[in-house]
Amino acid sequence: MRIMAVRLVAGAITLALMAYAWLAWERARDPEPITILERVLERGELRVITRISATTYYQTDKGRAGLEFELAQAFAHRLGVQLRMLVAPDLEAIFAALDDGEADLAAAGLTYTESRGQRYWFTPPYKDITQQLVYRVGTPRPDDLSEIGPGELAVIANSSHADRLRELRNRSHPDLTWAEDEHADSEAMLYRVWNEELRYTVADSHELSINRAYYPELRKAFEISGVEGLAWAFPRTEDLSLYNEAARYFTDLRLEGTLSTLLEEHFGHLGRFDYVGFRAFNRHVADRLPRYRHWFEEAAEEYGVDWRLLAAIGYQESHWDPQAVSPTGVRGIMMLTLDTASMLGVDNRLDPKQSIFGGARYFSRLLERLPEDIEEPHRAWMALAAYNVGYGHLQDARRLARQRGYDPNDWRVIRDHLPLLSQRQWYVQTRHGYARGWEPVHYVRNIRLYYQLLQRITEPGRRQVPAGEALGEPPLPTPPAPPGAPLPADPPAD
């Protein structure tokens, strides 16, 4: 009996071992399929297809930049893998890369449309935009699509704009015609309208806002869509592992406030547009900036600041006019007060080199003076506000924000609190009293815009149009200073 029991146990063990070996062999022969997310992690690389534009991805002298790049870089970091950005020449190539498996996702300022949604998965949108019909000042402004004649309208092929026009033609404008360019990008289409090679095009609202800074005559005629969302696109497969991770990523970005910070950094300074001001800026880039650029660069290197930011400050202060004088007595390119100039060791505020180096030194001191827990880019914007309104008033606004339960290290919060310094119910609570708090808000916004323009103008490899040529005007000559000519000096202090 005992022998039989032993034999039964031995047989059971043998059968179990045989079954285990058979299962192991089957698993080795036909392993479980690896998910897309697991494949990315195993590869150690996230492949992202994009396009080059001011709103997506581009190169600067400091490396890669653009909203889509920053979003993709943070997502790759979250996954613990390296980021590989693939650049497509057009929209067709972007979608082909998804279809062929060459890219894991597309981050290219893509709008969700019904037709695209049938072929690809789209994440929750990260930015709202509208589609706008664009024309140039001096050409007829249409009030409706029915006023657009044959040969007057062109858009990018395979774009959401083309999809929207087809929808509108089928619904209410059967006679509407347009051309589709398979090789152009949004900036090229806007340039063609500005250069009067094309009467009309369609652009997303944020792209028009940025490009109007380069081509001030461009205008929105009307919107052809309601609010739409920009999102990432993924191949429409049954495996949603990577897509779900990206969807959670965007949800977390929104909840943490990181997404709004990024959008503010890239688009928060585009709220207002000054047509005359941008024409003047483009003209001064050609005729004034070359005289002083080397001093901006030298001062920037000495004080660890981007020279284009210093130049943007100088333009906001004086339009790069070394003889500038305000009614309050501030003088020179960087518009230094007499007291500030004395503190900085500037003997002659009308000497452009002394003024530029003095302004750089002052801005650098403000950056260093701010509390260490203020991070970039908030730190730079607050230092700019202090440059304009004074460090004490900036700190008053930060204290008010803290008292009211807001984050005093967030520029968006301080931007909303600075104007309170002009209202008695608030400034009586501060150490430094009344200030025209709306002025530093406009001041910072303008400098951010000039800074972005200078970054784009000086971008490596960018196809540049000389400012005078871009405005349809000959660039003004730069008159040389007579050898040894003395610079005008500050008048003696009272």
UniProtKB/Swiss-Prot annotation:
E.C. no: 4.2.2.n1
GO CC terms in record: cell outer membrane
InterPro entries: Lysozyme-like_dom_sf (IPR023346), MltF (IPR023703), Solute-binding_3/MltF_N (IPR001638), Transglyc_AS (IPR000189), Transglycosylase_SLT_dom_1 (IPR008258)
Stretches for region Non-LT domain: 25-270
Key word Acyltransferase present: no
HAMAP family in the cross-refs: MltF
Signal peptide: 1-24
Region Disordered: start-end pairs: 464-494
Comp. bias intervals (Pro residues): 474-494
Protein name stated in the entry: Membrane-bound lytic murein transglycosylase F 1
Residues annotated as catalytic: 317
Gene: mltF1
Enzyme class label: lyase
Family: In the N-terminal section; belongs to the bacterial solute-binding protein 3 family. In the C-terminal section; belongs to the transglycosylase Slt family.
The entry's keywords: Cell outer membrane, Cell wall biogenesis/degradation, Lyase, Membrane, Signal
Entry function: Murein-degrading enzyme that degrades murein glycan strands and insoluble, high-molecular weight murein sacculi, with the concomitant formation of a 1,6-anhydromuramoyl product. Lytic transglycosylases (LTs) play an integral role in the metabolism of the peptidoglycan (PG) sacculus. Their lytic action creates space within the PG sacculus to allow for its expansion as well as for the insertion of various structures such as secretion systems and flagella.
Bilayer topology annotation: Peripheral membrane protein
Record's catalysed reaction(s): Exolytic cleavage of the (1->4)-beta-glycosidic linkage between N-acetylmuramic acid (MurNAc) and N-acetylglucosamine (GlcNAc) residues in peptidoglycan, from either the reducing or the non-reducing ends of the peptidoglycan chains, with concomitant formation of a 1,6-anhydrobond in the MurNAc residue
